[in-house]
Amino acid sequence: MVQKESQATLEERESELSSNPAASAGASLEPPAAPAPGEDNPAGAGGAAVAGAAGGARRFLCGVVEGFYGRPWVMEQRKELFRRLQKWELNTYLYAPKDDYKHRMFWREMYSVEEAEQLMTLISAAREYEIEFIYAISPGLDITFSNPKEVSTLKRKLDQVSQFGCRSFALLFDDIDHNMCAADKEVFSSFAHAQVSITNEIYQYLGEPETFLFCPTEYCGTFCYPNVSQSPYLRTVGEKLLPGIEVLWTGPKVVSKEIPVESIEEVSKIIKRAPVIWDNIHANDYDQKRLFLGPYKGRSTELIPRLKGVLTNPNCEFEANYVAIHTLATWYKSNMNGVRKDVVMTDSEDSTVSIQIKLENEGSDEDIETDVLYSPQMALKLALTEWLQEFGVPHQYSSRQVAHSGAKASVVDGTPLVAAPSLNATTVVTTVYQEPIMSQGAALSGEPTTLTKEEEKKQPDEEPMDMVVEKQEETDHKNDNQILSEIVEAKMAEELKPMDTDKESIAESKSPEMSMQEDCISDIAPMQTDEQTNKEQFVPGPNEKPLYTAEPVTLEDLQLLADLFYLPYEHGPKGAQMLREFQWLRANSSVVSVNCKGKDSEKIEEWRSRAAKFEEMCGLVMGMFTRLSNCANRTILYDMYSYVWDIKSIMSMVKSFVQWLGCRSHSSAQFLIGDQEPWAFRGGLAGEFQRLLPIDGANDLFFQPPPLTPTSKVYTIRPYFPKDEASVYKICREMYDDGVGLPFQSQPDLIGDKLVGGLLSLSLDYCFVLEDEDGICGYALGTVDVTPFIKKCKISWIPFMQEKYTKPNGDKELSEAEKIMLSFHEEQEVLPETFLANFPSLIKMDIHKKVTDPSVAKSMMACLLSSLKANGSRGAFCEVRPDDKRILEFYSKLGCFEIAKMEGFPKDVVILGRSL
């Protein structure tokens, strides 16, 4: 019905236009000059439009644009967004997802009845939360501007959307080719004239809506030719575009580090109006390894009186945008009335706010903020403090989505993303009603559940936090100065107090959907049998393991998380500190080398002290990963897990590498020199650490997709110590027995002596072990140059083995164990020099079968190869029995390939190699 009604309306309008010669296709399509800002504009035919606010000032548009490339948000996420926007006093949502195919690629297609119902529901929800819903359409990929049928198709599409209740619109011509087709070139003098013509026509057709946005093709300073002030394109837009139409602008660049006041004044002059900023500071669709959890930054509050609005285009992952939107709201509210800085500073240059900003930035790696009204670091801390409450509230969407590391997940719940519906199918929000694995301290953010008296006594006493994290209603009626003063006073406190866990305040922070689901808890809770009810709670004995309880996410965890995933052009203070420390430890590692001449005890002590602090910082990352993985709110976890998994994995490698640097015998100068700016490379902080490792190009080892089911298990890779020998031998024996089924009960050390003993004794510098909570469960061993290693073996290791194992009688048929014993008494074959020139290093790796995480083996191989390449190796090889299919497959998955047989190769082994 919705479609039919909109089509009928369009037919009536087209009949009116056909009777009007001025509006016919034969009329000139060149747009007239835009009337003066105060001049009346003729009303269009669109009956669905809302009258403009004549004579009244338009409100400042501030909110979110869903304009990224990637899987669009689902409807329930958008409704949750509206709730948050209202709570934080923002007012606008621009619907423009690039991968909604009816928004961009197939813009001509009308919405189906089902899609129409969803859009109407969404528009209604926005109205309920007092959020202005702006529908954007991007016809620029293939529209013929001079074709009346194309223009009519666009009108028909927007007519349909207006029937849904939408009153605000946007035409986007971003990221398209500048060249016009031959038909358009005959009618329009330039690309800008064509765009302005159709924009003006649509604007008037819809009745000149109060909010109508236009995104130019030259939407940032770097896209303007030859520059902003001399751009013919922007000049045409400024002169011809009707004054009631606002222009979107991203700043000096597509992703602008800063948006100076001068740059806005420059573009405003040529487009003859104040722009609306489409801000990509938190957008991550251009780099699938990066996430941005830092504050809104680099935009002075002096911009507010010079703009018509700011819409942030944030991360693709919805739940990762809490900080981005919250800090934008803080920025906006800090100068909501558009007060100029010179007015603020007239009373006192040393105002309370500026003093607090100086205090907040003391000892910080960041530049001291000069904006007297807004401090990014203060805004970040406020956002993280409020966000912390969300982690303890059990919640997840019914269609769970876990994006893999690297490329975004292309299939969710078995449904390919190709030709996905333009409006996501209705997604029902469900709340997980199972008791989360939480420690007693987790109560600060947990689901309000009924506790027994005994449990209530165990809960720690908590105070409400006397900051802006209090009930939202208390701030609704306060003026800006009161709010600002309260923020400053609260931030002067030395420590943040625990958050209020009062059930009423928790309930107020929840979405209506969550509250509704909680009302129905009895309907969906799993059935409890009499047997379960009568069963006493298990209490472990004195010699048994205690019950596992997960620690809750802390504010320090979120601060560290934000620092690791900060902003496009900079890392957070802790992330930058870790990067600098690793660079210093790597560059100065020669001072702790055993063979270092002229040792300086002070330098050695400094290196070891800084290494210990760095390892401690790496440990904080592991702890943050564990607590986040165990958090009750799985919705947040699923959106961020792949990113946290990546940083955890790379920091595990880096920590192991630093430990190796501190205990090796040889110094090396194989490291890269010179530091680049953090934003010069892709991949964020994890990418920066990867590039500082010697094997930075081994992308297959660094590509470690997270498990389908999030896990908090953490493995440790560290250098081998002599005390670990028995554990390594045990793993070697168990895995060998598992492969051939021949236990060596009478000689338990035999297989270990054969496969790993020489490396453990003579090549200690290149040996690593894998540990979990139960002990050692894997090893990675190597030697940088096998030729001198074999010579050492002949001198010391082989004679010791010959003495330990008597040479068996070769006249009889030998057992597997006897064959290994005999090998110690036979001449060792030497590999060809032509082969060793390219693959000089010998490696041996194995992991216990209980380890099921495939990323662990990649991390171990990365650590081993990093140590070898750091000391000049060009390649590594390993020797495998032809019948050992398990280990052959194991090495193949780690990037090793079979070397073609050549003269001098042993006949009873397969040689696999890997270039470094």
Curated annotation (Swiss-Prot):
Its EC number is 3.2.1.169. One of its GO terms (cellular component) is membrane. Gene3D superfamilies: 3.40.630.30, Glycosidases, STAT, domain 1. A protein binds at residues 67, 98, 174-175, 219, 285, 313. Residues 452-461 have a biased composition (Basic and acidic residues). Inhibited by N-acetylglucosamine and not N-acetylgalactosamine. It catalyses: 3-O-(N-acetyl-beta-D-glucosaminyl)-L-seryl-[protein] + H2O = N-acetyl-D-glucosamine + L-seryl-[protein]; 3-O-(N-acetyl-beta-D-glucosaminyl)-L-threonyl-[protein] + H2O = L-threonyl-[protein] + N-acetyl-D-glucosamine. Changing residue 286 to S: Nearly abolishes enzyme activity. Residues 60-336 form the GH84 domain. The active site is at residue 175. SUPFAM superfamilies: (Trans)glycosidases (SSF51445), Acyl-CoA N-acyltransferases (Nat) (SSF55729). Changing residue 175 to A: Nearly abolishes enzyme activity. The modification Phosphoserine is found at residue 364. Residues 1-48, 441-465 are annotated as: Disordered. Optimum pH is 5.7-7. Monomer. Interacts with CLOCK. (Microbial infection) Interacts with human T-cell leukemia virus 1/HTLV-1 protein Tax; this interaction increases Tax interacting partner CREB1 O-GlcNAcylation. This is Protein O-GlcNAcase. The gene is OGA.
